[in-house]
Amino acid sequence: QRQMCIRDSNCACKMNAHAQTSEWNMTVYDAHVNLLRSQTEAMSAALAGVDSITVRPFDKIYQTPDDFSERIARNQQLLLKEECHLDKVVDPSAGSYYVEVLTNSLADVAWKLFLEVEEKGGFSVAVNAGEIQNAVNASNVARKKAVATRREILLGSNQYPNFTEVAADKIQEKGSCCCGGGHCGEATIPALDFSRGASEFEALRMATEKSGKTPKVFMLTIGNLAMRLARSQFSANFFACAGYKIIDNLGFDTVEAGVEAAVKAGAEIVVLCSSDDEYAEFAPAAYKALAGRAEFVVAGAPACADDLNCLLYTSDAA
């Protein structure tokens, strides 16, 4: 805002800035984490000096907000005012080098984009041509890829999911879990993609719920303590993202004991978790002991992966 006024010496009016918390990073599963997301966004807006803020209720993406969620959304702003006293300071981040550098860099990029749009005929022309939509949608695709590869974390969706949670019963607006947006009538211009970051993960979990059967995934942990814990945690997160039931273990003395425990637990998938050096010994033994009674997975990408594949395929052929 200040940069625009500096560039235009005739600027005589103060811009009115309104901020609204995002829906893009909201999630259906573990929905109360949405409170932390929206509170962080509201605080950022207050620090930036906006004139007004709208905090979205944490349950907005899957149902009509109730009295509780709307009251909490209002109170989130009151916390910033009455307990953090963000209304008492004109510019709370003034003097913070990293905040001001980041702010200036964002403002410079935004100004360049603004000028590019104006040079092409203005915002209306750019929207009708689909240029704005293409740029926004490309950004959405890039961020979704970051979520899919866990370079961007959404707690409860692609990291530390609660696999025991069932969401189908609480979803009132059926389109929300996989979309997050809507339309009325036939579009006459290219549309914006309003889908949220967690939408694909939620669709995967909903498919598991609708199937009526929750696969059990057994962590066969053995050998090197540090490596088996790291790989069992990664594998548990991986399968829990699909809503599969995770059966974790403290470790087994022998592969055979682990396999029998997995079969006794009724596991459909057995994940061997150990170190790269030990996989050459444990993987063939576990695969042989399992004898096709469940799907067999080796956690990680060990250097001996090609040798293991050849050995396991040879065993199948035999």
Where are these predicted regions, by residue range?
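Short glycine/threonine-rich loop-to-helix capping motif typified by GTGT followed
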Residues: 22-35, 63-73, 98-113, 132-147, ...
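Peripheral docking tails and interdomain loops at the edges
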Residues: 284-318
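Conserved phosphate/anionic-ligand binding catalytic regions in large, soluble enzymes, centered on
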Residues: 35-55, 59, 122-123, 226-234
